[in-house]
């Protein structure tokens, strides 16, 4: 996840495509899932094109969308999840169908506060699952799937490597969008957001507990990395790079760093998966 910081992950994935590295299981959360589908559909450069072409387009994101009573989201929902993938920068549904593995997106059940892991398929042409995994509190309305409201998967499971192991993976590559040593903290704005969700107490709890869970997850990840069970790829620094970054030079630099790291580690990853 990490909104536009995920352009780092896009660089890594494009490098892996170049080196023909494709795992048989992919799980993503928030933007990690929304951009990850283009990895499974083998469309290098697609995510970068979308961000560069539309990051400063009001139809894509902006306060006007949030204030629109028919949209109620910082992103233009129809534009981002229908017009772009189905018309402007087409998503290759046929190629995704050829993907030999399984692709999951993490969503958070608004009523229980628990993570749910939804399998993405091309039957979901409205991209409901991708909307739900990206649905940040306040910036998105609740996204309903089968009459159940959902929000961003990062609220309940920010780094879903444990689910990968539970589902039978024995070797996992984790791509993070924060630098080594990063620790998440509970800010005053997060506490205010939690109060705003008083009608959904389990979401309020998720918001308050998220930083602690995230940091605990990182600690466990470090141990697994030392044990050789995971490979972790992350940027050197995200300082000065906003979640909703619009500076195209910064975006390109972050993508290039991800691509370079992906190329550098591709041999190790290929060997890791071949064990």
Give names to the regions the model predicted.
Residues 1-29, 37-275:
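Patatin-like phospholipase
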């Amino acid at each position: 996840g990490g909104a536009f910081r995920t352009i780092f992950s896009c660089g890594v994935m494009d490098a892996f495509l170049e080196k023909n590295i494709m795992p048989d299981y992919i799980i993503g959360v928030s933007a990690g899932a929304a951009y990850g589908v283009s990895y499974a559909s083998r469309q290098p450069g697609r995510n970068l094109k979308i961000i560069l072409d539309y990051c400063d387009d009001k139809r894509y994101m902006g306060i006007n969308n949030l204030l629109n009573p028919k949209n109620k989201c910082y992103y233009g929902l129809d534009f981002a999840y229908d017009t772009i993938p189905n018309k402007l920068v087409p998503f290759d549904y046929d190629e995704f169908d050829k993907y030999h593995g399984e692709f999951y997106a993490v969503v958070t059940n608004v009523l229980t506060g628990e993570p749910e892991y939804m399998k993405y398929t091309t039957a979901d042409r409205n991209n409901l699952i991708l909307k739900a995994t990206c649905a940040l509190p306040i910036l998105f309305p609740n996204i309903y799937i089968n009459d159940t409201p959902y929000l961003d998967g990062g609220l309940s499971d920010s780094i879903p490597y444990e689910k990968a192991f539970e589902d039978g993976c024995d070797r996992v590559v984790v791509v993070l969008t924060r630098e080594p040593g990063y620790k998440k903290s509970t800010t005053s704005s997060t506490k205010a957001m939690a109060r705003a969700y008083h009608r959904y107490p389990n979401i309020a709890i998720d918001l308050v507990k998220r930083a602690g869970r995230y940091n605990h997850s990182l600690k466990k990840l470090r141990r697994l990395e030392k044990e050789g069970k995971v490979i972790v790829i992350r940027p050197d620094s995200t300082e000065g790079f906003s979640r909703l970054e619009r500076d195209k030079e910064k975006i390109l630099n972050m993508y290039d760093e991800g691509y370079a790291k992906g190329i550098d580690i591709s041999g190790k990853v290929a060997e890791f998966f071949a064990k």
